[in-house]
């Protein structure tokens, strides 16, 4: 096979529209219920297929090796091992999503790597099989491979496609890094939210069980959330630090973005129930 270049594979961000922690298992993992929705704000990856199993990553990130970089290479290596593929790839990452913000950027990069290389290497795995590989890389990876907004249960691996409204979001990124591990290890984290049916959850007020704890531990998150709540219904996504406000119209979100204090960064993006990654895959 001669080297070929495939451009513009999106790795979209996600929002947790709600996140409920139901229990802690004996193995330390947490049972949860959450609703994932994609937003049209993405990292982008380019791939060049190589005739040898070599894997090489280029990134626009200043740090030498970041978590997302590791996951990209781990994803590619895992696909090689699962399929005994003897091809390799040169990969370019255009990193646009904030790191460690609860938007799933590293997991999304890994998912896009698996989906793209499965196509380009012609390894022929189904999305379900790719999801099995992805789950070993991170609990959020399967939802990005699944490619549709989803209600997730268990530790996040049990997915059911859903179609919530697709509003505009203003996403703000406080300049702090929240450790997911520390949040889930904190004794003050609520772990007893009752499990509810999907129908009940979709018709109940949405909340993030991690939000109160994170806001208490990270004043910048609390300050940013309080500012955004002045303009729209707002919550934290994942374990933070990013928070989002919901708007019916794009211009409404942009008007609030224009008022943003200089100390806070943010962007406007539309909710998407079909992942931009699936739309890119359909072009192949």
UniProtKB/Swiss-Prot annotation:
Keywords tagged on the record: ATP-binding, Isoprene biosynthesis, Kinase, Nucleotide-binding, Transferase
Database matches in Gene3D superfamilies: 3.30.230.10, GHMP kinase, C-terminal domain
Pfam families from the UniProt entry: GHMP_kinases_C, GHMP_kinases_N
SUPFAM superfamilies: GHMP Kinase, C-terminal domain, Ribosomal protein S5 domain 2-like
Record InterPro entries: GHMP_kinase_C_dom (IPR013750), GHMP_kinase_C_sf (IPR036554), GHMP_kinase_N_dom (IPR006204), IspE (IPR004424), Ribosomal_Su5_D2-typ_SF (IPR020568), Ribsml_uS5_D2-typ_fold_subgr (IPR014721)
Binding site for ATP: 98-108
EC code(s) of this entry: 2.7.1.148
Ranges in a coiled coil: none
NCBIfam families assigned: ispE
UniProt family annotation: Belongs to the GHMP kinase family. IspE subfamily.
HAMAP family membership: IspE (MF_00061)
Protein's UniProt name: 4-diphosphocytidyl-2-C-methyl-D-erythritol kinase
Organism name: Shewanella pealeana (strain ATCC 700345 / ANG-SQ1)
